[in-house]
């Protein structure tokens, strides 16, 4: 069996690529190691889509419950620095949209279920078939020929290992906590982020539905703060009042707490032969700006554009040029975002008094300079597209 793109990983990005290419008449096959299980209903983990990512989903007919964010306030918890971002500053309806991870994943998986091989995975990629097709071997020993192999299988990408990509990674020494909460507020389209020595604390509205939660919390804490044996729940209970005081709101946790260690990673190259890394398979960053999934969609968009352009050309598709164009468009942009997030993490975790003063004045200063604010918002919203 042959196909244009074999996609390893039936997550959000892998299924999006399959759906987008299928709409454009390009054959795909998704290989997913997990079972085709019933849709998960858990409503805890959320992701934040920028306007461009939402537009990409709208274009392939994906609709899930959303919560709109029109205003974001960023606060230096150790000082008086504040910066406000508003959607009207970039002439958009909203700055971003919050969706439940499972809602989006289930919708995309359902759309692509007929093109997915479940409970299987790639174990070999053979580039020596001919100059156009490669051959992939699956765990069940079946072989498939494909023009491209797209690794969309997450930060521990099996495809990256099979193709011997060179990994770079670093540990932030932090743990992220996420849970949903009920918060009484006058404006359900506002989000807040507080930087302090008790962690980076983000509050965002969550989609309404058959649950009592109104908001989602994403809280990054230093591992040293929980190394004394305290549980995540105990640490949260002891420190939540600090953020309630800063934000002048009562936060009532509604769900269990999910937690995961924070690391970044990237690869020196995104392409090798017929193989390409996309989304979390290629890179991961600190979640403080909520941009991880949006970088994945930007990757997927660029890859799909190049494949569609190559596929629709009158001559035989130049697969090497297609992949090189994708890599040029995305690799440096993703690395810049990773380094930028690392910079902000180090600035806001610093206990140096001079740096504390500089960041305090810096936030307030940027808040008064419209063109700088507009630049940051445009970048985060996906409008600075390559």
Model feature map: region roles:
Residues 142, 147-249, 257:
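Conserved FAD-binding catalytic core of PHBH/FMO-like flavoproteins
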Residues 305-386:
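C-terminal helical "tail/cap" subdomain of flavin- and related membrane-associated enzymes
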Residues 8, 31, 152, 279, ...:
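Active-site flanking residues adjacent to catalytic metal/cofactor-binding acidic residues
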């Amino acid at each position: 069996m042959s196909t244009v793109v074999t996609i390893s990983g039936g997550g959000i990005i892998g299924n999006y690529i399959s759906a987008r290419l299928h709409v454009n008449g390009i054959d795909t096959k998704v290989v997913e190691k997990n079972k085709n299980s019933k849709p998960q209903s858990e409503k805890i983990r959320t992701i934040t889509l920028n306007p461009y990512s939402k537009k990409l989903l709208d274009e392939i007919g994906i609709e899930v419950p959303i919560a709109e964010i029109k205003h974001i306030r960023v606060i230096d918890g150790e000082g008086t620095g504040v910066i406000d971002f508003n959607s009207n500053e970039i002439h958009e309806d909203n700055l971003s949209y919050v969706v439940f991870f499972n809602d989006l994943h289930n919708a995309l998986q359902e759309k692509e279920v007929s093109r997915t091989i479940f409970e299987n995975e790639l174990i070999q990629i053979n580039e020596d078939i001919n100059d156009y097709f490669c051959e992939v071997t699956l765990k069940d020993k079946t072989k498939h020929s494909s023009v491209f192999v797209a690794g969309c299988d997450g930060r521990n990408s099996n495809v990256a290992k099979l193709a011997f990509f060179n990994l770079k990674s670093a540990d932030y020494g932090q743990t992220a906590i996420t849970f949903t909460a009920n918060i009484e507020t006058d404006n359900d389209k506002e989000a807040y982020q507080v930087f302090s020595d008790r962690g980076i604390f983000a509050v965002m509205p969550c989609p309404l539905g058959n649950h009592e939660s109104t908001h989602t919390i994403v809280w990054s804490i230093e591992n040293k703060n929980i190394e004394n044996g305290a549980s995540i729940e105990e640490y949260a209970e002891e420190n939540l009042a600090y953020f309630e005081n800063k934000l002048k709101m009562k936060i009532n946790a509604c769900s269990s707490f999910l937690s995961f260690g924070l690391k970044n990673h990237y690869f020196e190259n995104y392409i090798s032969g017929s193989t390409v890394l996309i989304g979390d398979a290629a890179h991961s960053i600190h979640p403080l700006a909520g941009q991880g999934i949006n970088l994945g969609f930007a990757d997927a968009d660029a890859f799909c554009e190049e494949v569609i352009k190559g596929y629709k050309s009158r001559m035989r598709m130049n697969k090497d040029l297609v992949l090189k164009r994708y890599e040029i468009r995305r690799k440096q942009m993703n690395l810049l975002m990773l380094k930028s997030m690392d910079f902000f993490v180090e600035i806001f975790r610093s206990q140096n008094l001079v740096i504390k003063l500089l960041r305090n004045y810096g936030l307030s200063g940027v808040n008064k300079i419209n063109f700088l604010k507009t630049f940051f918002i445009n970048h985060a919203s996906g409008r600075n597209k390559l």
